[in-house]
Each structure stands twice: as C-alpha cells, then as structure tokens.
C-alpha cells in the first residue's frame, strides 16, 4: 500500500523519466543476453569454437568500464539526457551491425563496441532516474530500476523463442536494434535532470577535472569498487554455473533447467523491488546486510536440497536475496557519489566491479574440478556453496564499514 502511495505521489514527468530509464536498462540487457542463447549457432556460422564466441561475451563485459567512463564524463559535462540518447543509439547500432557480420573478426569488433555502449547506459540512466525522484521514492525506484536486467533476460528468452526458430540468429540482433526507438520517447517526453540543471556550472567545471576527483575521493573510489566487486561476485557466483550444476550434478535436462531459471529470475525481480523499497525505511547498508545474512542461511536449501521442489524454492529465495541486495545499488551509489561526478562515479565503480569479477564462473569451474565427488565428477554444489558463503561474508563486512547517506539531498 505504501509503495502504491509513493507511485501515486510522483508527477507525470517523474513517471515518464523513470520509465525511460527502466526501459533503457531492460533493453540494454536484452541486447546482451540475446547472444548467450545462440552461442552454438554463431560458432557454427563462423567455423570457430564455442570458446571463441564465449570470448566475445567476455570482451563485451571487459569494455563496459570504458563505456561507463566515456559516457559518464559526457553526462557530467553535457547533462544526462542527451548523452543517454547518444548511448542508446550507439549500442543499438552496434547490435544491428552484429547481424551483418561477415566473419568472426568483424563480429568480435562489433561486440566490443557494443560493450562500450552497454557500459555507458547504466550510469547515465541510474543518475537521471535517482536525480528525478523525490527522496522518499528513491528506494523503490532503485529496486525496480535494477531489475530491468532480469526483465531483459526474460525478454531475450521470449525473443529467442519467437524469432530464432523461424529466422535464425542474425534476426535476433536486428530485433535487438529496436531500443533505438526509445530515443524518440526520451526526446519528446523526458526533461534534463533537475539536479544537473541546478548544478550546471559546477558540474561542467568539475567534469574537466577527473584527476582532481580521483585525488579528493580515492578512498571512496577504492571502497566503492571493492563493494561492487563483491556484489558482482555474488550475482555471478550464484547464477552463472547454476544451470550447469542442475544439469551436470543433479541430472536435469535443458528443458527442465529453463523453467527453473525463469522461476529464480522471478525471485530476483520480486527481491529487488521489495528490498529496494524497504531500504528507504531500514537504510541502504542494513538492507544489504540483512539480505546477505539471509542468503547465507539459504545456502543449504539452494544447493544441497535432495528434493527438486525444495531446490527450486531455494533458487527462488536465493535470487530474492541476491537481487534484493542489488536493488539498493543504484540509489546507494548515487547517494555516495560526489555530486559533480554523479554521471561518472556510479557507472565506473559498477563496471569496474563487474570487470574484476569477470572470472567468477571460471574460478568456480576450476575449483569444482579440484573438489571432486566420489564418482570423480566436479563437485559444483560444494564449490558454489563455499564461494557464495565467502562472498556473502565479504559483502557484509564491506557494507558494515561503509557510509550511510540515505535520503541525502542531491
């Protein structure tokens, strides 16, 4: 009821702005996940190994920090709105061009360039959304905004199901260019960030002095990157190898695994929205800690349950907690950010954390081969449980020693 009252209290401009930012992140995630569904087909088309196509996904992730830096600095210099529009057009164009790649090398170049665009969208969208919301609505808005990533995955699954069987993998990337149409909506209905407008003079001056920002805020930068590294290890560590665990260790088929993935993604959406909302009452750090503690308690059900229904329930509630903590991230990083660098700071630390955790799945796979089961097969359950426990503990410590700036005036 209170969440509905908060939504009702938003004016038309605030609702339109938030919708644009949410759709931007959702459609960005859609474009990213489309490739994950057709790795085998792309490899066959270009006569390369699956490993090489997976490298294209990794390269996209590696380029995201560069995109966050470039478009974040543009956002601090010229406002959030126009750089966001340019970014959406850029990553949509790279997605479209991917469909016409004549060979693997060109395909790799387009995916790297797409990674720059993907990295730029989150920081600009999050800062525009948070700066356009009243303080009391930030927690709920943060939780819903972050779940655009999960919505993007579900949307990618639907597009794959509808388009791929009839038109092949290249058509997926043509459909993936449709986010460019969002620019028309932003151009017509979304104003510039009111916070950036008020701070326009100081923001322009500050955006020219990135070195000064680093010198004055280096402790905060290091802390935020460590925090986001823990966050990204938490999400990658509980998601990336979970389908492999279900198939290789629990003996489930692909057709059985897919519905389970949808169920725990629904848990992620619910968790991010609900805990994002309650962070407005409990505080950002306390909400993160609560989610991490409950996540630790869920590990046995999530990974060791002998019965499949319990395992599915464990997956749902584990992602409820993981993405519940993530639901706090957009608002927490924006509240911690130096005001003049709010276009740059959240996106860069988010993407740097993502970059530093890019080896999470590989690390778990290697450890699983070391901690084998009695039959000699990799022990994914034990490995994922240990890594997840360690990451949750690290996240609790980092959240506990950090600053709380809930409701700070922008």
Predicted regions, residues:
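Cytoplasmic helix-loop-helix junction between adjacent transmembrane helices
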Residues: 110-147
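Cytoplasmic membrane-interface "Motif A"-like loop-to-helix N-cap segments
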Residues: 77-87, 281-292
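Cytosolic juxtamembrane N-terminal segment immediately preceding the first transmembrane helix
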Residues: 1-30
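Helix-breaking motifs and short loop linkers at transmembrane-helix boundaries and internal kinks
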Residues: 47, 79, 100-106, 134, ...
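Conserved MFS/SLC helix-loop-helix module at the cytosolic interface between two early adjacent transmembrane helices
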Residues: 66-102
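Extracytoplasmic gate region of multi-pass secondary transporters
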Residues: 35-36, 218-269, 357-361
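Helix-loop-helix hairpin linking two adjacent transmembrane segments in secondary transporters
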Residues: 145-188
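C-terminal transmembrane helical hairpin of 12-TM major facilitator-type secondary transporters
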Residues: 279, 285-329
């Amino acid at each position: 009821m209170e969440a509905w009252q908060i939504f009702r209290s938003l004016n038309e401009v605030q609702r339109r702005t938030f919708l644009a930012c949410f759709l931007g992140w959702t459609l960005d995630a859609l474009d990213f996940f489309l490739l994950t569904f057709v790795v085998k087909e792309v490899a066959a088309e270009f006569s390369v190994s699956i490993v090489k196509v997976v490298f294209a996904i990794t390269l996209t992730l590696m380029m995201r920090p560069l995109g966050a830096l470039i478009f974040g600095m543009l956002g601090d210099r010229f406002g959030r709105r126009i750089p966001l529009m340019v970014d959406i057009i850029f990553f949509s164009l790279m997605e479209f061009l991917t469909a016409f790649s004549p060979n693997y090398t060109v395909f790799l170049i387009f995916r790297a360039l797409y990674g720059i665009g993907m990295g730029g969208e989150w920081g600009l969208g999050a800062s525009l959304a948070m700066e356009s919301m009243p303080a009391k609505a930030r927690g709920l808005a943060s939780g819903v905004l972050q779940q655009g990533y999960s919505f993007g995955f579900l949307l990618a699954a639907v597009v794959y199901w509808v388009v791929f069987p009839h038109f092949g993998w290249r058509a997926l990337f043509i459909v993936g260019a449709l986010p460019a149409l969002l620019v028309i909506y932003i151009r017509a209905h979304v104003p510039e960030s009111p916070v950036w407008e008020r701070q326009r003079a100081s923001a322009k001056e500050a955006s020219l002095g990135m070195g000064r920002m680093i010198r004055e805020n280096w402790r905060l930068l290091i802390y935020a990157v460590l925090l986001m590294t823990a966050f990204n290890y938490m999400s990658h560590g509980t998601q990336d190898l979970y389908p492999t665990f279900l198939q290789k260790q629990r003996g489930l088929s692909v057709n059985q695994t897919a519905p389970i993935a949808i169920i725990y993604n629904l848990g992620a959406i619910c968790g991010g929205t609900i805990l994002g909302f309650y962070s407005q009452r409990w505080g950002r750090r306390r909400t993160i800690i609560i989610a991490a503690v409950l996540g630790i308690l869920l590990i046995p059900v999530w990974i060791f349950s002998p019965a499949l229904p319990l395992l599915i329930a464990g997956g749902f509630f584990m992602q409820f907690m993981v993405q519940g903590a993530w639901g706090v991230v957009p608002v927490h990083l924006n509240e911690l950010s130096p005001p003049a660098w709010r276009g740059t700071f959240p996106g860069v630390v988010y993407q740097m954390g993502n970059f530093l955790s890019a080896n999470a799945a590989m690390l778990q796979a290697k450890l699983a081969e070391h901690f084998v089961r009695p039959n000699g097969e990799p022990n994914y359950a034990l490995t994922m449980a240990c890594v997840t426990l360690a990451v949750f503990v690290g996240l609790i410590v980092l959240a506990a020693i950090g600053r709380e700036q809930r409701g700070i005036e922008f």
